[in-house]
């Protein structure tokens, strides 16, 4: 291997229902993960040691970085002494609820397992992924829409893609997931709809009456504390989105659009306001790892 570059895609959450809190302090949830066409790029080069550089000087490149932690965890799991020099071209905003760091960690696990030829099993990789972060298993194991429960690590591939244009906006606010879980407005006693069945009705039957059930439980508190995020959602709806929502714990907001014309108009409007924006086409799924290499 001289040099290899791999795309690392982000996600949005279509609905995020917080269902309880475990004895260990972690919250349980149910959500739909959907991939979007917003990605970081990770370059891998031969090295005797594990090292990292990053295009964003605000991100650590030591053991506090998930990519480094993922590489070391894999190395220790396989009792492997091989190394790699990684370069992260950071494009996906952090503190946005898009899972960029988790996706990067999953890419490192998957790619180094192959490059080092250590044959760590899928089950072992899953365990490593869960320890790195609740969203990491999704990026490691799924390509399209997936239902998640538990802390987000219990996954079911739904075999579907969104048949809509998706506009995702970063309002230039960084929101801590820890803050979001401390401040969301708890409502554990409400009935929880089956998001899987509702998603099938939406994607296969075009039944938009189900969209009201796809709530994000972080949204009310985030909107109260970060009013700019609420304005972005309202702007997407004004631009023709038939559904808009916070992604994860925010601050990114996405909107679903029927037509490319309306979606492109929303992208232009958001960019003119100085926001970072991406447009994801209908039917998008994360490419197989070979197809994601540059």
UniProtKB/Swiss-Prot annotation:
It comes from the Bacteria. It catalyses: 4-CDP-2-C-methyl-D-erythritol + ATP = 4-CDP-2-C-methyl-D-erythritol 2-phosphate + ADP + H(+). GO terms for molecular function: 4-(cytidine 5'-diphospho)-2-C-methyl-D-erythritol kinase activity; ATP binding. The active site is at residues 11, 135. It is an enzyme of class 2 (transferase). Keywords: ATP-binding, Isoprene biosynthesis, Kinase, Nucleotide-binding, Transferase. NCBIfam families: ispE. Catalyzes the phosphorylation of the position 2 hydroxy group of 4-diphosphocytidyl-2C-methyl-D-erythritol. This is 4-diphosphocytidyl-2-C-methyl-D-erythritol kinase.
């Amino acid at each position: 291997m001289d040099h290899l570059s791999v795309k690392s895609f982000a996600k949005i959450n279509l609905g995020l229902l917080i269902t309880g809190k475990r004895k260990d302090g972690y919250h349980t949830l149910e959500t739909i993960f959907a991939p979007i066409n917003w990605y970081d790029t990770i370059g891998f080069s031969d090295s005797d040691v594990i090292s990292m550089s990053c295009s964003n000087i605000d991100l650590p490149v030591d053991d506090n970085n998930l990519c480094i932690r993922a590489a070391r965890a894999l190395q220790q799991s396989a009792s492997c002494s091989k190394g790699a020099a990684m370069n992260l071209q950071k494009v996906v905003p952090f503190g946005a609820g898009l899972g960029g760091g988790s996706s990067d960690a999953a890419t490192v696990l998957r790619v180094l397992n192959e490059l080092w030829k250590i044959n760590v099993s899928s089950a072992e990789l899953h365990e490593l992924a869960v320890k790195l972060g609740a969203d990491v298993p999704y990026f490691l194991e799924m390509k399209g829409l997936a239902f998640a429960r538990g802390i987000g690590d219990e996954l079911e591939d739904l075999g579907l893609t969104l048949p809509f244009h998706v506009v995702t906006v970063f309002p230039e606010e960084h929101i801590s997931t820890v803050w979001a879980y401390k401040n969301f407005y708890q409502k554990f006693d409400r009935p929880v709809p089956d998001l899987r069945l509702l998603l099938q009705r939406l994607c296969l039957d075009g039944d938009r009456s189900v969209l009201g059930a796809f709530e994000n439980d972080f949204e009310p508190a985030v909107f109260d504390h970060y009013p700019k995020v609420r304005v972005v959602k309202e702007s997407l709806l004004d631009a023709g989105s038939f559904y808009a929502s916070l992604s994860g714990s925010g601050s990114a907001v996405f909107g679903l659009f029927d037509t490319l014309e309306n979606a492109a108009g929303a992208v232009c409007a958001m960019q003119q306001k100085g926001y970072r924006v991406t447009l994801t086409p209908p039917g998008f799924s994360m490419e197989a790892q070979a197809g994601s290499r540059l």
